[in-house]
């Protein structure tokens, strides 16, 4: 029995080390791929430190150097179990949003902006715009709202860059409304709803797949009662980062999120 307990203990502290190394490795991959200033990747460095500290405490405890009180151990297990359960539940909502199917003949679609570099759209934004262009061609009576202000390092508003891209793809500029004040997803919805005459209108939300669920939640908070998701492909390298990021932001759906 003692050997089983010892093996179980050894397995558990090895798990913490593996988690720390995975977080550190993914942080290095993201930082190399997108730069250290890329949205939210610092969470992986924090995760590496967090799991590394747990590993260190477990090693010191097994060696008899320190002792962790039983009540603290129970509190830790309860907190971790609660956090893991909440994480799984929210990720299930995000995955459900990713599988959304656009409805035909929307009255409006809102294309959510994200960072541009100078005057140039990024890959993530191009993916969103390509979905919007395809939908606009198939649904010629739909009004398009491109939503995004001007952020740091941007020579123009995201809305204007999106407008130019869609016009270059053959979409009539008279169909496109530019909402150019928003700086985050909450403001995207808050300011875009002002251009929608009837909040019961069918409104499609165009954004990257991981972002659909929270965007529709924010749309409801802004007063839109009838929305559907129009998911665009996400960056494959940063996909896990974005999934975790939106999960954490889901519990507080109105902060500045950079999208």
Describe the residue ranges of each PLM region:
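Membrane-water interface of alpha-helical transmembrane segments
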Residues: 6-13, 17, 40, 66, ...
